[in-house]
């Protein structure tokens, strides 16, 4: 599957699950703390579709490329949770790819350990910054 098609599918499913800015942030913060979605009030069917896409080893190379590009984008908008949180409100693509990063490393779908560690570190740093910002406000 072509990179843009994967990205479009992921964005579509994520927007079905988390249609508002607050739902996105809640989802990101809750996935950071748990491997279940019981504390997230979003439709689970689109999330299951995202998981199925990320589980497909043939698509993981493209997904990883997209994820790395989005990590670079997130890094460029600033290190504070406030900037990242506001960035997600106007950019659904980084928000969904950010959550896909979570699925890739947390559920062990990604086999390349170097990429897994880079993605894990980036995810945790960004999620921690956003959670800290939300807890302060």
Curated annotation (Swiss-Prot):
Signal peptide: none annotated. Pfam families: DUF1951 (PF09188). InterPro entries: DUF1951, MG354-like_sf. This is Uncharacterized protein MG354.
